[in-house]
Regions:
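Cofactor-centric catalytic regions
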Residues: 1-84, 96-188
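Short acidic capping loops at alpha-helix termini that bridge into adjacent secondary structure
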Residues: 87-92
Length: 188
C-alpha cells in the first residue's frame, strides 16, 4: 500500500474514538478492509454505454452488462443525472439486450459501477456537448457512445509497482466491547 491509497485516512478517522475508548479502559477491536474493483490482473476489462435520444425526447441508456441485483440501472441513471443537465424524468434505463446494447464484459457490482459507470460518464460528455444550444427534439435519433478500458498488469508482471486493479476501496471499523457482557457496545 502506498500513499495514493486511502487506508491510512480510514485509520486516522477512527483514531479519536479509539484513543477515547482506551483512555476509558474499554476493550476495543479494529478491522481494516480493502476491496478491489474491476477484473484486473491483465485480463481485458472494458465497459461500454450508449445513450440514444429517442422519439419521447428522453435519453435512453443502453449497456450490455448483466444486472444481477447489483443495481447497475440505478448507477447508470445516477451517472447520467450527475453528468448531464437532464432531470431524472428525462432518462430511461433500458435493460440489457444483445440487439442494441454494447457488450460490457463480466459483471459484478463494483466492476460495473466503476468500469461501465466511466463509459457512461464519457457518453454523457458527448451528449452534453451536442446538446449545447440545442433541444432534445434536435437530437432525436442521435447516439452517444462511451467506452472505458481498464488497463492493468498481469500477475507476475516484471516491472516495479505493477497495477493489479484500477481502483480499491478501503474501510476501517472499530468496536467497543462491554466488559461485563462481552457484547459490542458501539461500532464506529
Amino acid at each position: 500500500v502506498n500513499n495514493s491509497t486511502g487506508l491510512v485516512e480510514t485509520l486516522e478517522a477512527v483514531k479519536p474514538y479509539y484513543d477515547e475508548a482506551v483512555k476509558n479502559g474499554d476493550p476495543v477491536g479494529i478491522a481494516c478492509a480493502m476491496k478491489n474493483a474491476g477484473v484486473g490482473v491483465g485480463i481485458p476489462d472494458w465497459g461500454r454505454c450508449k445513450l440514444i435520444v429517442e422519439e419521447d425526447r428522453k435519453v435512453h441508456i443502453y449497456s450490455g452488462a448483466s444486472c444481477i441485483g447489483q443495481g447497475l440501472g440505478t448507477v447508470l441513471v445516477q451517472m447520467t443525472v450527475t453528468n448531464t443537465p437532464l432531470r431524472r424524468e428525462q432518462i430511461v434505463y433500458e435493460r440489457s439486450n444483445t440487439w442494441i446494447a454494447p457488450d460490457s464484459g463480466d459483471t459484478s457490482g463494483s466492476r460495473q459501477t466503476l468500469i461501465t459507470g466511466e463509459a457512461c460518464r464519457r457518453a454523457c460528455e458527448l451528449f452534453t456537448a451536442a446538446l449545447e444550444g440545442k433541444t432534445m427534439h434536435d437530437l432525436i435519433g442521435r447516439e452517444f457512445y462511451g467506452e472505458y478500458y481498464a488497463k492493468t498488469d498481469p500477475l507476475g508482471a516484471n516491472k516495479p509497482n505493477p497495477v493489479s486493479h484500477v481502483a480499491y476501496g478501503y474501510a476501517t471499523q472499530m468496536c467497543v466491547v462491554d466488559k461485563k457482557t462481552g457484547k459490542v457496545e458501539s461500532l464506529v
